[in-house]
């Protein structure tokens, strides 16, 4: 069994280091603290799918280091509440909101997405969650929570990067699970759970090609900065992350592991 690696906590805690910023910029074409499979084009389209305006109240499920939520507040002027189970992510996110002078619009809290959330019914105009639900054991509860929290005219966008598309070996599955919890979905299960939660599916879009491209860019950007990254995270962790990214690229480029973006309404 491969030793688990630190993928997310190290990225969150090293968010402000120049080397990690360079990796993100080379991977995505812009830098707001990304650690997901959201392409730049997709990140720009999400506000349109959510129909955001300056009056919108938005919930970010699994906000990571908060960069995307902060960017929404700066670009659109909407109010964003983000939550994240990782303590380092929440700490980094709130510090970023202060630094970017949007703490009046953006707030971050620590919660578990699969637990009952302390927010009122119909309290958000838009909810989004990028590549998070595949780490949550009770996906049905998350979707039911979302249906409860979304106002009657609201939109919900989420992505799942772990939809099974073909034969995958035990070793490949193990490599695809570097740290934390990972849940792989058979085709059609997300559509089924969306319907059972009371949400309406508007679109299910295959974005696997973006995942294949980003994983290759991410791997190569890190490889160029090998010495600096080893100094930050250690050689064993560096090599583990590189194996992970190479594995993601292989599985997605061969379409044995798929990613979908789902747009829903209440």
Role assignments for model-derived ranges:
Residues 36-54:
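Conserved alpha-helix/loop element of class I SAM-dependent methyltransferases that forms part
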Residues 59-61, 65-115:
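Class I SAM-dependent methyltransferase SAM/SAH-binding core
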Residues 161-181:
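Short, glycine-/aromatic-enriched active-site segment of Class I SAM-dependent methyltransferases
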Residues 1-27:
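N-terminal, positively charged/glycine-rich alpha-helical extensions of SAM-dependent methyltransferases
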Residues 117-126:
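A short acidic, Gly/Pro-enriched loop at the edge of an enzyme's catalytic core
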Residues 205-266:
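Conserved Class I S-adenosyl-L-methionine
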Residues 183-198:
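Short alpha-helix
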Residues 140-155:
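A short glycine-rich, Lys/Arg-flanked "PGG" loop and its adjoining helix->strand segment in the class I
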């Amino acid at each position: 069994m491969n030793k688990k690696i630190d993928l997310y906590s190290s990225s969150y805690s090293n968010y402000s280091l120049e080397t990690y910023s360079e990796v993100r910029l080379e991977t995505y074409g812009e830098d707001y603290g990304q650690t997901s499979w959201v392409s730049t084009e997709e990140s720009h389209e999400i506000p349109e799918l959510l129909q955001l305006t300056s009056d919108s109240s938005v919930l970010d499920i699994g906000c990571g280091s908060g960069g995307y939520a902060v960017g929404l507040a700066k670009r659109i002027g909407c109010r964003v509440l983000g939550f994240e189970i990782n303590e380092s992510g929440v700490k980094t996110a709130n510090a970023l909101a202060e630094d970017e002078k949007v703490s009046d619009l953006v707030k971050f809290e620590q919660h578990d997405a699969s637990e009952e959330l302390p927010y009122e019914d119909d309290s958000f105009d838009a909810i989004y969650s990028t590549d998070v639900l595949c780490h949550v054991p009770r996906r049905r509860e998350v979707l039911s929570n979302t249906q409860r929290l979304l106002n009657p005219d609201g939109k919900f966008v989420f992505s799942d990067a772990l939809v099974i598309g073909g034969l995958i070996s035990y070793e490949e599955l193990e490599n695809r699970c570097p740290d934390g919890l990972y849940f792989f979905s058979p085709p059609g299960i997300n559509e089924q759970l969306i319907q059972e939660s009371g949400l309406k599916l508007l679109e299910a879009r295959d974005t696997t090609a973006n995942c294949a491209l980003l994983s290759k860019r991410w791997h190569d950007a890190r490889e160029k900065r090998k010495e600096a990254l080893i100094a930050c995270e250690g050689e064993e962790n560096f090599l583990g992350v590189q194996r992970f990214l190479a594995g993601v690229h292989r599985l997605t480029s061969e379409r044995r592991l798929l990613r979908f973006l789902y747009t829903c309404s209440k």
